[in-house]
Amino acid sequence: MRHKVNREKTFTVITILCAVIIIGAIGLCLYTAIGHPEDAVYYAVVIAIMAFTILYVYLISPKAIEFNDTSLIMHKVVGKIIIPLEDIKEIRPYNQSGLRLFGSGGLFGSIGLFTNNDIGRHYEYVGDFSEAFLVVLNSGKKYVFSCENSDKVIEQVRSNIRN
């Protein structure tokens, strides 16, 4: 069963504002580069970095959570994280973020490596913290995901990891 990742309003507003600012900055760089062709390489590098950043964060953003008989799968725009059910030690609701170590704390959601006092280092792929849940693996690795009907996903995974 596949469940869509929803975006909370805060993340949607941050994404729109960041996109407007980055597009404006790219436009300003292009405008300035036209007047200063001797600095065109510098502006091209700045534009490439800004464009790559927004594209990369979009491509790794979460789109859906899928649950089947053998695994929990977090689908990104490009790629997926597959967690075999036998690797899951614990799954429970979890609605708080942490200190961002590497990633995005608002652009397309909360995505990347985070840490906090409660669960330590963990990876977040969250669109809406009111629908978030923590997955702890036997290896100690931790993920925070979110999706619609997260309570049903938690219940289904729990019933399958106990068997």
Q: Predicted regions span which residues?
A:
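Membrane-helix interface/capping segments
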Residues: 61-78, 85
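Hydrophobic alpha-helical transmembrane segments
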Residues: 36-48
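Transmembrane alpha-helices and immediately adjacent membrane-cytoplasm interface residues
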Residues: 45-63
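Terminal membrane-proximal soluble interaction domains of membrane-associated proteins
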Residues: 131-160
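Non-transmembrane, membrane-adjacent beta-strand/coil modules in membrane-associated proteins
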Residues: 2, 75-139
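Short, surface-exposed linear segments at secondary-structure transitions and domain or protein termini
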Residues: 13, 91-97, 151-160
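Short aromatic/basic micro-patch
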Residues: 66, 82, 144-147
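N-terminal membrane-targeting/pre-transmembrane regions
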Residues: 1-37, 134, 140-142
